[in-house]
Curated annotation (Swiss-Prot):
GO molecular function terms listed in the Swiss-Prot or TrEMBL record: diguanylate cyclase activity; GTP binding; metal ion binding
Site (described: Transition state stabilizer): 441
Localization in the cell: Cell inner membrane
Source organism of this protein record: Salmonella typhimurium (strain LT2 / SGSC1412 / ATCC 700720)
Catalytic EC class: transferase
Catalyzed reactions: 2 GTP = 3',3'-c-di-GMP + 2 diphosphate
Membrane topology type: Multi-pass membrane protein
UniProt-recorded name of the protein: Probable diguanylate cyclase DgcQ
Amino acid sequence: MPHETLLDNQGWFKKLARRFGPGHVVNTCFLIVMLFSTLLTWREVMILKDAYVASQRNHLGSVANVLDRQLQFNMDRLIFLRNGMHEALVAPLAFSALQSAVTQFEQRRVRHFWQLELDKRRTLPLYGVSDQFVARTTLLSRESRDLANELTATLELGYLARLARSSAMLALETMYVSRSGFYLSTLPTAYGSDIVSRYYQYVTQPWFIEQSQRRNSQRGVRWFTSAQPYVTDEQKKVTASLPLDHDNYWYGVLAMDIPVASLQRFLRDAAEKDIEGEYQLYDNHLRLLTDSAPEQQTANTLNDRERALLAREIEKDTLGGLRLGTHYVSWERLDHFDGILLRVHTLREGIQGNFGSISIALTLLWGLFTAMLLISWGVIRHMVKNMFVLQNSLQWQAWHDPLTRLYNRGALFEKASRLAKRYREARQPFSVIQLDLDYFKSVNDRFGHQAGDRVLSHAAGLIGSTIRAHDIAGRVGGEEFCIVLPGATKAQALQIAERIRQRINDKEILVTKSTTLRISASMGISSAEEYGDYDFEQLQSLADKRLYYAKQSGRNRICASDATQEREKK
């Protein structure tokens, strides 16, 4: 087994080359190529994703604009009615019919229910309840000094409300409910106790109660959703309400009821050309009002977790998008409705669409390129590995003796010279052993060269297993070996040589099927500490000279000094 001492002062490039062989270089190159191809593909995916998000927002924005314009049309009518009534409060008309209506009110105000009507063809009737009913709660009051003006303004509102009705409006009912115990509505009420129940229903609704000056300090339009559990889908509605104030006094509320069914029809019409995605309208509490899904199809509703995630995102911006499982949800707040419009796009719709086709093609291209890259990497890696193995084999053959598997003469001298130089600079001991097998020629002559080869291989194995890990050994001649002992003093070298001599002498070798042979070795030792000379060739020559003395003294001996001072060891 060959021993090799690694030099600490090798160049950084050689160390790097030793650490990173051709296989590592191939792996690194292919890894860089795959990384860049993946990054480029990922960049394309991000661009495609941004385009997809922009497409979703554009689809949602077009439908939201149509719905918002329609709601704005209705809100403009409501504000127009409020402004007209406010003008009537400030400057009431001095028509005799209006004055007569005030007189009739004074006569009927104590009744349980009553009705005032000026002209059935041009105005809407006014319905009211008694003073006793109004006095039951602090929310209602007939103590206003402008009660007569409010009454005439409400009658004038009847003209405007009748004229303002249009088939293009989403609203089913427009009404004014006064805190003074009367109301006006575009939907007629049968004369009787229904007037009381209807007025009671109005003044107990959130859209009326929440318009007090304390609860609505901005005095703007507010939206409310009917959330009663017993209300059917056909009866669901949203209500827009607007307070009527003058001189810091709250007179009442103008309101407009819009059926959810009307919103659904309008939403389906607006999204008719958009064959992908589903539109959903939610109120400000994220309660689903309606959707654009066909009647035979179930809507993609949000669960509680998805609703919470969406609510958190809505707090940050007025529009955006969010991936929820296999759905992509884009949302936008409406300008004229206190709620949001959602567009839900499923994974199946995305795959079947244009962006899905592009994504699939991009994925297939990346997969094909990656597969080709991996196959090429495997082929080149295999070729480089074979070349590297061949190179190492040739290099090993160039440095080692094929029979003994120790260093050959050239490699040994090169490595030993570098070691000697290093230990000379460090001023550390350095020793050399020269070894020769005794009577080796007779082994070849008696048993043949194959037996001789077996003896050489056997001796080399014993040498390699006896020396230290950082020592090196090589075959420098026919049956002659050289052992380099860096860091070993002459005494230590003598101990190592003695162990080698004993092991070689103690082991028998099977040279033929029925014949064993015991061999011996003679050795000469030299050390740099003797003369301070670290020149390896000089040390090897001196050890070889002492080897000759050992042989002259009878073989199977070690000579560690000149012939006049040598000590024999058997």
